[in-house]
Amino acid sequence: MSSRSRHDVKGPAGVSAHGPSTRQLRVAEEVRRVLAELFARTEFRDPELLDVRITVTEVRISPDFRHATAFVTRLGRSDVEVLLPALKRVAPFLRTGLSKALNLRTVPEIHFQPDTALDNAMELDEIMRSPEVQRDLNSKPE
């Protein structure tokens, strides 16, 4: 038998092959909650972020807790990609807010990614409602 336990199995980029740990999930949810509060109550000086409603849908934390990837969407619009440079500019400010709100040894560096899950679901719904698919669904098998 190998000297490595089953908990030592690593996948690509050092990520555990068994998924995130319970602590990673817990910290990620706390980071998501604090980021959502900061976006809801903070007036950003960046002109690209004025009067913009941003929703943080998910946060993933790296195994070493040094990096957090926040998946964001823009309320009512799907063009969140244009906001990514502005979000990158305010990331240090948001990290400071995280450090004040969370009791962590290392406050993660925040990286932003657009959350396309809602767009994908809407596109799939549109496809499912198309006449061609409805015809195929309603046809009787031979």
UniProtKB/Swiss-Prot annotation:
The keyword Repressor does not apply. Keywords: Cytoplasm, Ribosome biogenesis. Residues 1-22 are annotated as: Disordered. It is found in: Cytoplasm. One of its GO terms (cellular component) is cytosol. Gene3D superfamilies: 3.30.300.20. Coiled coil: none annotated. It comes from the Bacteria. InterPro entries: KH_dom-like_a/b, RbfA, RbfA_dom_sf, Ribosome-bd_factorA_CS. Residues 1-10 have a biased composition (Basic and acidic residues). GO terms for molecular function: ribosomal small subunit binding. GO terms for biological process: maturation of SSU-rRNA. SUPFAM superfamilies: Ribosome-binding factor A, RbfA (SSF89919). One of several proteins that assist in the late maturation steps of the functional core of the 30S ribosomal subunit. Associates with free 30S ribosomal subunits (but not with 30S subunits that are part of 70S ribosomes or polysomes). Required for efficient processing of 16S rRNA. May interact with the 5'-terminal helix region of 16S rRNA. Monomer. Binds 30S ribosomal subunits, but not 50S ribosomal subunits or 70S ribosomes. Belongs to the RbfA family. This is Ribosome-binding factor A. It comes from Gluconobacter oxydans (strain 621H). The gene is rbfA.
